[in-house]
Amino acid sequence: MEVREELKEIIERARAAAEAAGELPHGEYAPVQRLEIPKAKEFGDYSTNAAMQWARTAHKAPRAIAESIVKYIDAPLVSKMEIAGAGFINFFLAADTVYAELRNILSAGASYGDLPKDKKDKILVEYVSANPTGPLHIGHARGAAYGSALVNLLRAAGYDVYAEYYVNDAGSQIAHLAESVNARYLQLLGKDVDVPDDGYHGYDIVETAKSLIDREGDAYLSMDEEARLKVFKTVALSEKLSILKKDLADFHVTFDNWFSEKSLYPKQVDDALDTLKKDGYLYEKDGAWWLATTKNGDDKDRVVIRANGEPTYFCSDIAYVPNKEKRGYNKLIDIWGADHHGYIIRIHSAMKFLGYNPEDFEIMLLQMVTLLRDGQPVKMSKRTGQAVTLRELMDEVGSDAARYFFCSRTLDSQMDFDIDLAKKQSSDNPVYYIQYANARIHSLFAQAKEAGVKWGNWEKTDFTKLTEECELDLVKKMENYHMLIDGAAKERAPQRVAKYAYELAGLFHHFYRECRILGVEEGVTQARLGLITAVQHVLVHALSILGVSAPERM
């Protein structure tokens, strides 16, 4: 049993003993709700406000309740307890508890941090889902890093998770893509044509047209335009998706499924719309079909089918949510750009009308990213004169730095991305600082091996040799990693893992400066090698959640 859960049981047993002794009245006491790690070491290793929680039931002052609880706690798990303020109980772990936790970490090895796969929820996380009409930009990059880290975090926390990319391949944007590629293709072959005003004017479209010419030359010129556009629609979409998948793979982002919007047509879309019509939520006006979202607080009803018969984006989304639910997912998480905020009430309305619970659909909004170079905003790419792409960012700062920086901030806050800091090979750069801790550990392993030291028999290692404060602080930090994973997953907050990894690396660097591993008593060497082995396991686990590599040399 984890220390935190064991402490909760100890507290509740002490309360029951106080009840039995008549010091607390009998009543319906709720389980301990909060047992947290204090921000300052002087307040112990764990702290609870249980006495305050039970004050109303006991009809006593929280401090008096705390005194009764402490009186009936006799547990070797803790070395001492203190009552603070109005009734907080602070617990200081016994040294034997700390040593036992170190053994637990070493026993679990690389899987330490993985929680039991006993969660009932089956979760589908959909993220990025950018239109496949051009390269991914830094806004997409932020969503990609955060989304994949969230998937990794939920899996580590024991959830059944499925990652999906929704490919928008059914709308007018694909027709505009084909028209734009067609225009560039003809231009490159000497024809005087313009890219349509509603087309795509990016440099990448020229690249796609060039690749067509490189492969097929002018073979498509002999086709009539309708046939050529049909081919270009397929070829351009395939090429754009291929580039997009390559960029994401190089960014350590993978999906379990690439879901085609076209697959929803016609049956699943028709079924959803028929249900809405039958129940009176979808109505016809001015030749178009409207969903009555004002019934759920929207400022106006929304068009689903235009008067010309063309479906809106909203139309396929109405069918996509039931599709997810019917595949067995009872929790849906989407990551959208902040500009989609007004879309939330629409999709939640459609869910409610179709008989689904909107509370099962979590929508996380990501705010914009500002790239900074020399302290100044970077507006455009020097190469293309357009928005900076994910590929360009990876080429300049690397995947690891980009992912860590994106994962270290909450999605709902605007972010300044300091390119100069991300490129630094020093402790000023947080990802370098963390990776360097891992590299240092491997360097220590190499030195120990070269010195002929054998280690790894943890059952026979005497960890009571670890008496320095910096050593015990490391173990205590690692002991609460499980709690961190559980809490961060529930909060959908991979940034907490990023912060934890940085703090653990800091504790290790302090230990490295203060404690020698070689050239000391053999038992101390063995114990410290066990300690840094545990640190290495936890650091690598945390970095893997963030999608950041753990190089052995730097």
Regions found by a protein language model. Name each.
Residues M1-Y99, A110-M554:
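Non-catalytic interaction-recognition regions
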Residues A100-I105:
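Short, charged, solvent-exposed linker or helix-capping segments at domain edges/interfaces
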